[in-house]
Amino acid sequence: MSNQSKKGKLFLALLVPVCILNACTSTGKKPGNADSSKKEETRKVQYLSEPLISSIYTADPSAHVFAGKIYIYPSHDIDAGIPENDNGDHFAMKDYHILSMDSIGGKVTDHGVGFDIKDIPWAGRQLWAPDAAYKNGTYYLYFPVKDKKDVFRIGVATSTNPAGPFKADSEPIAGSYSIDPAVFTDTDGKTYMYFGGIWGGQLQRWITGKYDANGSKTDSKQEDAPAINCKVALLKPDMKNFDGKVKDVLIVDSLGKPLLTKDHNRRFFEGSWMHKYNGKYYFTYSTGDTHFLCYAVSSSPLGPFTYKGVFMKPVQGWTTHHSIVEIKGRWFIFYHDTQLSGKTHLRNIKVTQLQHNADGSIKLIDPFLQD
């Protein structure tokens, strides 16, 4: 789930679009020409991909293949009239619309509301980025939402249908906190949940193991210390509880040293995902306020993960919450931007191909077409 920063606002301001056919135009003042600032310059922005759906605003797409069909579990963005802030209060989502498609490029079906915040007994506000999984005839929907004390927890809901409706458990997952659950089932049948996000995701307020309501609003504030890590927990066979302690997802550089708090171009911020390719585990994530999607690789789903680089350049809008899935032997990344609205809290989901190079690296993706 995205937060809003001054850098994000500046980035968006440079690219606010008005959609025209399959391209867009944005207007802005000419740099370094204050005397003629009233004259607006129009330039064309061409996008790599088009929105998958335009009838509603969607973001944070978690895509999976269930029973041969592609199902997408996105956030459902709404305009709640709440002023933007770095805490992300303007992301006031209340339900999930579950989408499906038979193939990439095919018709997208909106199955309507599959889950609503009013059906979560312990929920307060802000139903953010979900994920889903399947096991033994049951579909599991994992969701972050603030409880009645305004603390993010992660809950689970179940259904016999991938499109829902889903029924929430009466309590959040014990030991869970923060946002952005991403659930990965390995080839040995073990299932892991990766989760967490700093700033509005509150991960920095759990440094001591207990929630600090008066803690930092951003990160650890220790610039030369190791950055706050994403978290991972093994799930029990019931898919509803953690099996053991929550662990750090350690990201290290080529020398094996942890990435530091001040390393905003590489350190973890939010929006993690896990996929396995040629026996290696690819931990992908957003750097948040610098807008990159990065990846780190390990021989274990628990890490440590060695940072490898950026695999997607910044999109229009704020951070890029994504998912990566293999479909009929090809890999795709689902992501979002703000092409339809030009507003950071009203986003639209997209998809494009993701390619692994022969050496295992991921080919860099530019979300814009260059002239």
Spans of model-derived segments:
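Bacterial N-terminal signal peptides that target proteins for export
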Residues: S2-F11
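Sec-dependent N-terminal signal peptides
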Residues: L10-V18
